[in-house]
């Protein structure tokens, strides 16, 4: 999925989360 954060490494649920 497309990440809303800066990095697209980690996805949370149905949305892409930032690589924290």
UniProtKB/Swiss-Prot annotation:
The keyword Protein biosynthesis does not apply. Residues 1-10 have a biased composition (Polar residues). Keywords: IgA-binding protein, Lectin, Mannose-binding. Residues 1-20 are annotated as: Disordered. Belongs to the jacalin lectin family. Alpha-methyl-D-mannoside and D-mannose specific lectin. Binds IgA. Tetramer of four alpha chains associated with two or four beta chains. This is Agglutinin beta-2 chain isoform 2. It comes from Morus nigra (Black mulberry).
């Amino acid at each position: 999925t497309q990440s809303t954060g800066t990095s697209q490494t980690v996805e949370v649920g149905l949305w892409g989360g930032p690589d924290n």
